[in-house]
Amino acid sequence: MEKRELLYEGKAKKVYKTDEENLYIIEYKDDATAFNGLKKGTIAEKGIVNNKVSAILFALLDKNNVPTHYVKRLSDREMLVKKVEIFPLEVIVRNYAAGSICKRLGLEEGLKFKTPVLEFSYKNDELKDPMINEYHIQALELATKEEIEIMTGMTFKVNEILSEYFLSKDIILVDFKLEFGKSSEGILLADEISPDTCRFWDKNTMEKLDKDRFRKDLGKVEEAYLEILKRLGGM
C-alpha cells in the first residue's frame, strides 16, 4: 500500500490517495476547533486517540452488520478506508439534552429524552452548518428520500449498539454526529466516531470526557480523551 498525494485537509484530518483507486488513507491531527472554527487550539495526542477510538468503534459496528468505510488501522495516526462520496450532511443523535439544543429549546442540560432525537445539519462552514430537515435535503438534492431512510435507519442502529457498548464501560453516550458516503457497495458510515464527534459523560460522576472540555475551558482535555481510549481497551 503506497501513500500518495494529499487529497483534502480538514480541521481534524488529512485524506490521502493511495496506489489503489478505491482506498484512501486518513491521518488524524492534533488540531482542535470549536464554534465553527472561531476557537482554535491543539490537544496533545488527540489524533492518536481519535484514530484508535474510531478504529475500535468501526470494527464493533462492522461486526454488528453496520457497513462502514473502515478497512484497518495502519499506525497510531492513520487508518485505511474505502473511497466514498460524502453526503454534505451531518446526522446528529441526541439521547440527552446538551449543547445547542439546550439553548435552542430552553432545556436543562442532562435531561434524558423519552426517545432519541435525530437532526440533520447541512455541512457548510460559511453558513455554520445550519439545521435542516428531510424536505430541505430532497429539495436541494443533497440525498434522495430512499437515501435519507437508509441513513436514518443506520443511525438509530448505531445509537443502539454504541449506547449499550459505552454503558458497559460506565460511559453515557449523550449525543453524537455521523457522516455517510456513497460507494459501489452502497451507503457506508464514514468520517470518525471519537471524543471530537460525541459527547461522553462518566456514568457515575457525570464528568465530561469529550471535546466539551476544550469548548468550555474545563481543563484536563488530554486526560479525558485518554480516559475514553483506556476504557475501550485501546491502551
Swiss-Prot record:
Residue ranges crossing the lipid bilayer per the database entry: none
Pathway per the UniProt entry: Purine metabolism; IMP biosynthesis via de novo pathway; 5-amino-1-(5-phospho-D-ribosyl)imidazole-4-carboxamide from 5-amino-1-(5-phospho-D-ribosyl)imidazole-4-carboxylate: step 1/2
Catalytic reaction equation(s): 5-amino-1-(5-phospho-D-ribosyl)imidazole-4-carboxylate + L-aspartate + ATP = (2S)-2-[5-amino-1-(5-phospho-beta-D-ribosyl)imidazole-4-carboxamido]succinate + ADP + phosphate + 2 H(+)
Record keyword Ribosomal protein present: no
Record's keyword annotation contains Acetylation: no
Enzyme class: ligase
Gene Ontology biological process terms in this record: 'de novo' IMP biosynthetic process; cobalamin biosynthetic process
UniProtKB keywords: ATP-binding, Ligase, Nucleotide-binding, Purine biosynthesis
GO molecular function, one term: phosphoribosylaminoimidazolesuccinocarboxamide synthase activity
Pfam family, one: SAICAR_synt
PROSITE patterns: SAICAR_SYNTHETASE_1 (PS01057), SAICAR_SYNTHETASE_2 (PS01058)
Enzyme Commission number(s): 6.3.2.6
Entries under HAMAP family matching the protein: SAICAR_synth (MF_00137)
Family according to the record: Belongs to the SAICAR synthetase family.
UniProt-recorded name of the protein: Phosphoribosylaminoimidazole-succinocarboxamide synthase
